[in-house]
Amino acid sequence: MSEYSLFTSESVSEGHPDKIADQISDAVLDAIIAEDKHARVACETLVKTGVAIVAGEITTSAWIDLEELVRKVIVDIGYDSSDVGYDGHTCGIINIIGKQSVDINQGVDRAKPEDQGAGDQGLMFGYASDETEVLMPAPICFSHRLVERQTEARKSGLLPWLRPDAKSQVTCRYENGKVVGIDAVVLSTQHNPEITQADLHEAVMELIIKHTLPAELLHKDTQFHINPTGKFVIGGPVGDCGLTGRKIIVDSYGGMARHGGGAFSGKDPSKVDRSAAYAGRYVAKNIVAAGLAERCEIQVSYAIGVAQPTSISINTFGTGKIGDDRIVQLVREHFDLRPYAITHMLDLLHPMYRPTAAYGHFGRTPVEMTVGNDSFTAFTWERTDKAEALRSDAGL
């Protein structure tokens, strides 16, 4: 990454208002997919003081108790009392969901499933880098870990005065494309009014920041900004309106890679905004894991109603062991990037999506899950099971 000597990424906790909205949208998707794997779901959520509004287009044979589902998500996150300003038990729930347009539906559904067309036009990117063990850029990786730790400290009772809303930001220093230090750390966390700023600063520094970030990357000149505006009691949907799909850079690569603009949460796998972005990560990660490149970015694009991608492009930023054109050939040979094939390849028709809606969709560990009678693996796009075959066919 020689073009930058410093690079900064941010993340937000599950209690951030935009992430509340994402989690509600994905919880709705999960509940529907659990009953109807052929459903078409595009679910959008808005949260603000005293209310959650759920909208979108959904075509399904399933029935879900939307109000109960939305309340459960909000309470699970930690907004369970008027004391914190937003209470999932009592807030208003407004449902304005409609059905998917028949004009869109006729372009997606096909007699043969493998001919399923893309749910929309668009461009999607996937990325991987060898700078961390999960093959993700370090700034976004560290930013996610900070807010994950904030939530862990809050929910475990280690720091019971924490509240759900939090943001993090990490600036990494690079030399010759490798991370050599962390130059700045920002962590803003909502808290109860009785905690002093001095006690908060000490606890956050010792039990969140130093507990999470590699000590060898922190140095005497590292800047630490903990709640830099001071008091942060009012947060969540009281402080800011939250919307589904407004944290697309947090959800992906922290700005290190390009982004096609489409959000993920609330969309079933027929929407290539989501499924093709997951496939792009799967492709890029396997290319880096195979040793074909130190960094890899893939772009794919689609036309609505058309199964085959309209383009597949690769950029290894000069780190490739073989040419980028040859890598594109290998991608076409080893990965079927038609929408139905992606869904099959990554086994996406399971209620696996709510866990993706906080702390990043990428750089996660594949995990076995069971929902009802359905057992499956989540985060399948993080597997590197194609790496050996790619390396062999590349002649490395």
UniProtKB/Swiss-Prot annotation:
Q: Name its cellular compartments.
A: Cytoplasm
Q: Where does ATP bind?
A: H16, D165, A166, K167, K231, F232, D240, R246, K247, A263, K267
GO BP: one-carbon metabolic process; S-adenosylmethionine biosynthetic process
The entry's free-text remark on the cofactor is: Binds 2 divalent ions per subunit. Binds 1 potassium ion per subunit.
Gene3D superfamilies the record matches: 3.30.300.10
KW Transferase (keyword) present: yes
| Needed cofactors | Mg(2+); K(+)
Amino-acid positions noted as binding K(+) in the UniProt annotation, renumbered to this chain? E44
Instruction: Give me the residues that bind Mg(2+), please.
Output: D18
Does the keyword field hold Magnesium? yes
Q: Which PROSITE patterns does the UniProt entry name for this protein?
A: ADOMET_SYNTHASE_1, ADOMET_SYNTHASE_2
InterPro entries assigned to the protein according to its UniProt record, in alphabetical order = ADOMET_SYNTHASE_CS (IPR022631), S-AdoMet_synt_C (IPR022630), S-AdoMet_synt_central (IPR022629), S-AdoMet_synt_N (IPR022628), S-AdoMet_synthetase (IPR002133), S-AdoMet_synthetase_sfam (IPR022636)
Q: Which domain of life is it from?
A: Bacteria
Specify where the region named Flexible loop lies, as residue ranges. Answer: 100-110
What GO cellular component is one of the record's annotations? cytoplasm
What is catalyzed by this enzyme? L-methionine + ATP + H2O = S-adenosyl-L-methionine + phosphate + diphosphate
> EC number(s)?
2.5.1.6
Write one Gene Ontology MF term: methionine adenosyltransferase activity
Q: Which residues bind L-methionine?
A: E57, Q100, D240, K271
Q: Which enzyme class, named as a word?
A: transferase
How does the record describe its quaternary structure?
Answer: Homotetramer; dimer of dimers.
Family the entry assigns: Belongs to the AdoMet synthase family.
- PANTHER family per UniProt: S-ADENOSYLMETHIONINE SYNTHETASE
Protein name (database record): S-adenosylmethionine synthase
State the species of origin: Azotobacter vinelandii (strain DJ / ATCC BAA-1303)
What gene makes this protein?
Answer: metK
